[in-house]
């Protein structure tokens, strides 16, 4: 649910990544090919894609209705608003082990979520796919995962288009624009997405 250097996991109840039309210029085609070759070797494993994203409480609607030919004007605040982050994993069309947290993610904090929230949510052998963020210490994560029969596979660098959870983050941000004013707590607004969409 919500964590500020503490863990409180929320469990929710395929399919695989669909490539977008844009890529980073830094992307290395050879590394992408290597990643896809490795992924194919885990054809009998459940695919688990994980990622983190951030949300600012300051969200506003960029569009509004008006009479034809009239411009809609609105004032927006220049103040800084609360920022929260979300880490979760996606299995097929479901998100699992979502956790909202404050402050920066660290290796130790991520590993605690990975061990205490994600791994217990996996009910069959899985290949866990994630990017190469600094706090993703692959050696530590592999050791924890392999003890339970799972594998860890890093995405090719600069290749978010191969992680389908990226599209979910965009969906959540659109959802928040419509419901944020209904909630006193920012974290409650974020977690309400799982209540209405994923259960």
Q: Over which residues does each language-model region extend?
A:
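Short functional hotspots at interaction and active-site rims
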Residues: 1-199
């Amino acid at each position: 649910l919500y964590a500020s250097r503490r863990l409180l996991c929320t469990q929710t109840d395929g399919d695989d990544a669909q490539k977008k039309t844009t890529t980073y210029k830094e992307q290395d085609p050879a590394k992408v090919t290597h990643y896809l070759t490795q992924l194919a070797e885990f054809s009998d494993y459940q695919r688990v894609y994980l990622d983190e994203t951030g949300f600012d409480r300051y969200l506003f609607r960029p569009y509004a209705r008006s009479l034809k030919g009239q411009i809609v004007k609105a004032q927006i605040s220049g103040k800084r608003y609360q920022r929260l982050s979300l880490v979760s994993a996606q299995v097929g069309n479901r998100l699992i082990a979502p956790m909202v947290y404050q402050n920066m993610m660290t290796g130790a904090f991520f590993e605690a979520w990975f061990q205490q929230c994600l791994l217990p949510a996996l009910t069959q052998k899985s290949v866990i796919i994630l990017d190469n963020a600094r706090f993703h210490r692959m050696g530590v994560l592999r050791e924890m995962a392999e003890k339970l029969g799972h594998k860890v596979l890093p995405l090719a660098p600069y290749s978010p288009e191969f992680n389908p959870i990226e599209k979910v983050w965009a969906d959540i941000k659109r959802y928040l624009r419509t419901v944020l004013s209904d909630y006193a707590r920012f974290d409650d607004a974020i977690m309400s997405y799982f209540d209405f969409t994923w259960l």
